[in-house]
UniProtKB/Swiss-Prot annotation:
It is found in: Mitochondrion inner membrane. It is a multi-pass membrane protein. It comes from the Eukaryota. This is Mitochondrial distribution and morphology protein 32. Residues 139-562 are mitochondrial intermembrane. Residues 44-117 are mitochondrial matrix. One of its GO terms (biological process) is mitochondrion organization. GO terms for cellular component: mitochondrial inner membrane. Its main location: mitochondrion. It comes from Kluyveromyces lactis (strain ATCC 8585 / CBS 2359 / DSM 70799 / NBRC 1267 / NRRL Y-1140 / WM37). InterPro entries: Mdm31/Mdm32. The lineage of its organism: Eukaryota, Fungi, Dikarya, Ascomycota, Saccharomycotina. Belongs to the MDM31/MDM32 family. Involved in the organization of the mitochondrial membranes and the global structure of the mitochondria. Also required for mitochondrial distribution and mobility as well as for the maintenance of mitochondrial DNA nucleoids structures. Residues 1-43 form a transit peptide.
Length: 583
């Protein structure tokens, strides 16, 4: 303490002594003049003296720094000249860069270096997880056998994935250009063990992947959303089995239902899906998704950029609906609060391939085909921390569906159609008119088609010359003032004089059903299968409502036309009898 006070007093006295002497500047070293020793100075003179003192002090400080740096450089150059090898020169340069000297490191300096090393590694792992793991795998592949590394990674994954067996046949190859880790010839299959509480019987699969590219993220792993960030699958094939062994949802099969994946891409894949007693051959040509969250599987799947594939060789597409008009910025605002409108289209597929004849809701359908077009309006579903007021107000999903059935054939079922919970959708008495309507339409259209396609023998007989005039013309002559009913062609050439009473006006036996379904988006949370949301039951009831309206309208028209025909016939007969009695 006294030492510090002594230094301060000495410096104060030195400054007072220097204030009485005019210090020379660098440019005026030779012109040094003595100052008058007057004791009374003005304020301006004292200020001028202080400026000169500051200049001289800065000059001396700069000179001291330059001398110190020159001494350090000379010491560094001297040490480098005395070094005998690369290790000595590297040691001198490293110490001079870190501590500006050649002395041994102190304990504080070593602890600081160690702390910075740990922090830098943590930052590297967090920001460049994929690169870090790629270097580790590349090092292991170089040092050890590639098969050993594949088995080691497979065994490691099997410890953390319940009821699954992962096997790598080829080596692990880091893809430096794409910034991902590439696995080749990967096999994933489910195994049954009694140690796990997961209902493994609910989902079983045996899949093979030609190539799998993944990127890792420690930040996602620290938040509990899984280590894998982006996933790309090429050449997947195998078999998947879904079993309704209990009432648990499929999302409970995953050990971490909150697993979040980033970009997911699947290309050139084909697998067989067995759902109950029905087999589906599903091909995925291209699937590009921005994200895939296990708790929002259905929502993220329908919000995919594009999904193209086939179900039992019938093409299907999922994409953003294209507008007929120009897509302006104002139109995008009109579409809010929905994220976008997704168009789902499934080309014509047999009802047997789709499994409608085996379903409990439409067990009366025997043959036919169907084409499905659906527009899905899904709201924005973000994380809870990112929810806005607009997203909270809109919590409903709207689906506009159109089913185009063609050439249906119905049968009387053994049991009444029911929903998934066992409730009856429609009774036998209400189902009879529907079956009669569908089968009558099929018979009429098949009869008309047969009549148009068959060329009878009497049409090929050469005409016989008879002088007697025919009692009826070959074609029906219609005056121009007569207008055709709605639905019939305006040009009536070579039409039959005698026709079926209920002959159809179109050439195709199509039955079009439309409906709109509104569903709360919260009901799609923690749902991995679309049928688990209850949409199928609502869809079945809406289709039956529309179908019954069509049948009632057909029965009314048929009854009305018969009554009109009967009344006209009776009136004409009475008129003829009356005229005959008068004559």
């Amino acid at each position: 303490m006294f030492t510090v006070l002594g230094r301060v007093m000495n410096r104060h006295c030195a400054l007072r002594a220097h204030s009485r002497i005019r210090m020379p500047t660098p440019m005026k070293v030779s012109s040094l003049l003595p100052l008058p020793h007057n004791l009374l100075r003005t304020y301006a003179t004292e200020k001028h003296d202080m400026d000169e003192l500051n200049k001289s002090t800065d000059y001396m400080h700069i000179q001291n720094i330059l001398l110190q740096k020159e001494k350090e450089l000379s010491t560094k150059h001297t040490l480098l000249k005395e070094a005998t090898g690369f290790y000595d020169r590297f040691k001198i340069n490293t110490k001079w860069f870190l501590i500006r000297g050649n002395r041994p490191f102190s304990f504080d300096e070593l602890s600081t270096l160690f702390s910075w090393l740990i922090i830098s590694q943590i930052i590297w792992v967090i920001l460049g997880t994929t690169t870090f793991v790629s270097l580790v795998l590349f090092t292991f592949n170089t040092v050890f056998a590639k098969e050993m590394v594949g088995k080691f990674v497979g065994n490691t994954l099997n410890k953390y994935i319940d009821s699954c067996d992962v096997e790598f046949q080829d080596a692990l190859v880091p893809e430096w250009k794409k910034g991902c880790i590439r696995f080749r010839s990967v096999k994933v299959r489910t195994v049954t063990d009694g140690k796990s509480d997961v209902p493994s019987d609910q989902l079983q699969f045996d899949l093979k992947f030609n190539q799998v590219d993944i990127t890792l993220s420690v930040r996602k792993w620290m938040t509990g959303h899984g280590l894998i960030d982006n996933l790309t699958v090429l050449g997947m094939h195998g078999k998947v089995v879904l079993n309704d062994v209990n009432e648990n949802k499929l999302v409970g099969w995953f050990s971490n239902p909150e697993y979040h994946l980033g970009a997911v891409k699947v290309c050139d894949s084909c697998f067989t899906l067995r759902d109950g007693n029905q087999d589906y051959r599903i091909s995925i040509y291209n699937m590009d998704m921005n994200r895939l969250r296990f708790e929002w599987c259905v929502s993220d799947f329908f919000n995919a950029n594009v999904v193209t594939g086939a179900i039992n060789h019938s093409l299907f597409t999922i994409h953003k609906r294209q507008h007929k008009l120009a897509y302006l910025q104002d139109l995008e605002k009109d579409l809010s609060p929905w994220k976008r409108i997704t168009r789902l289209r499934l080309d014509r597929i047999s009802v047997k391939d789709l499994g409608l004849d085996k379903s409990s809701s439409f067990n009366w359908i025997e043959e036919g085909s169907v084409e499905i077009i659906a527009d899905l309006m899904l709201p924005n579903v973000e994380d809870e921390s990112q929810d806005s007021d607009e997203e909270k107000n809109n919590k409903y999903m709207v689906m506009d569906l159109k089913f185009n059935f063609r050439d249906l054939k119905a049968k009387f079922p053994e049991s009444a159609p029911t929903l998934s919970n066992g409730e009856t959708v429609i009774s036998f008495d209400e189902l009879k008119p529907i079956i009669n309507y569908i089968n009558n339409r099929r018979v009429i259209f098949n009869s008309v088609a047969t009549t148009e396609t068959i060329d009878p023998d009497w049409n090929r007989i050469t005409p016989v010359s008879i002088k007697r005039q025919k009692s009826y013309p070959d074609t029906t002559v219609i005056p121009t003032s007569v207008t055709w009913p709605d639905g019939e062609d305006e040009v009536q050439i070579n039409k039959e004089i005698i026709k079926y009473h209920d002959q159809p006006t179109t050439n195709t036996n199509n039955l079009i059903l439309k409906c709109r379904i509104v569903k709360n988006i919260d009901e799609l949370q923690n749902v991995a299968l679309f049928r688990e949301s209850g949409v199928y039951d609502v869809l079945a009831m809406e289709l039956y409502v529309d179908l019954m309206k069509i049948v009632e309208e057909w029965e009314f028209k048929k009854k009305n036309s018969w009554m009109r025909l009967w009344g006209t016939t009776l009136a004409s007969q009475l008129l003829i009898f009356g005229l005959g009695a008068m004559v």
